[in-house]
Amino acid sequence: MDKTKIHKMWIADQGDGTYSNPILYTDYSDPDAIRVGEDYFMIASSFCNTPAVPLLHSKDLVNWKVINYIMDKLPFEYYDKPVHGCGTWAPAIRFHEGTYYVFIPMPDEGIMMCKTTDPWGKWSEPVYVRKVVGWIDPCPFWDEDGKAYMVTAFARSRIGFKSMLYMSPIEPDCSGVLDDGQFIYDGHATQPTIEGPKLYKRNGYYYIFAPAGGVKPGWQTVLRSKNIYGPWEEKIVLHQGNSPVNGPHQGAWVDTPDGQDWFLHFQDVGNAGRIVHLQPMHWENDWPVIGVNAVDGCGEPVLRYKKPEVGAAYPIDTPEDSDFFEGDRLGLQWQWNANYKKEWYDLKDGQLLLHAQTADPKTQLCDISNLLLQKWPAPEFSTTTCLHLEQMKDGDVAGLVSLGGCYTALAVQKINGKMSLQQRTGNWTKDDEVRTGLGEWNSDVIYIQMKVEKETYRTFYVGTTEENLQPVGQMVEATPGRWVGVKDGLFAINEQGAAGGSVAADYFVYQSL
């Protein structure tokens, strides 16, 4: 693979002082962000994938890089296997008295907290703020008098109701709650499905920025009050309007050092997940106005706009996607399908060695833990890998997988010393994986490519070189997973109950179509 032909997949910075939305065409769902000095930090939910809760950094709110993860693994053994739609939901990040705090809701376990003084370094192990089922989307807040609070929402799937917000006084060090707290807002009548609250204070008002109306069709609501427990005035401040951006909501208000205000939020586009947008914001009569073309204080999203004024020009940059496995650690674009083990892989001599892990042959591929995955980087693309198969053993199955609600994979299987091609297709909600044989494979090297067209149509190609790739198998339409977009990656398993062999990957490369 010629590295000079590899280009960034999605570039928001237009190089002329403007940016285009989305700033990240990648599934960084439920984003929250802060500014500390001249640095911006953003986090996102990641459900059952590990390492968990990605941390991104930017100097200008447009160009972002993944710099770390908040949790290396999920702190419960049952996440050693995929638990789709569970795990880490919408987190919040805050900076207080020299310490960075991240609150992480796990709807089946409780509200967790991690902290650090160095966001690039190691974060503390998660501890409970409150052990409780069904509480989600927590956000901490420290008032001028030193008292601390946590606002939360609720998951009806766990607790039986939603559309309510709750305030809890907490220890200033976030080590726990001080009392049971109380309900502070009921959105059933005017702000259904209100959730994802983020708490701020300005000019004597407490503000709760919160999405409402549902993930795909919803809007951004802001509540304000002179008392942290309410009563609250309410206002819808951002909606789709005449723009193509559905459900512009759930995110973070951030400012620049010179006082500009901006709002980061997601848009659910289906297969690619919840992608990230940046909107200009200003204040009128102590209400935020987000976006442009505001009517009665409610704006709509911009598609292109002048970049934030941050006092300097920074290089165009994007999160990593393609990987040539040249370092001594996996790139930060990669996550596993569940809690991972270091013995699953090695990086050696410019290759990724995937060691085939024992798997029950009845287990669907979507429920295999050692799938190494990354998020879709654009609406249309190809992804290509080169695998060396010499170290495969009988019972091994290895290849390229595209996960999602409906998933598919193109793999090489070794049985009785002979290798053959196989396509696996299924749906994580059903136990009906189809395994289709595609003929013998008589080479120790295989190039596998998958093309994604119109953010939906997935087609595989194989060859013994990059130049002789031929279509193989069936086109499979993509669908999103449980709260997540589609992810692509590599895997190696053994279905004969024995210690498996290995496959070596030279690269995993994305290219624009």
Spell out what each predicted region is.
Residues 1-513:
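Carbohydrate-active catalytic/glycan-binding domains of CAZyme proteins
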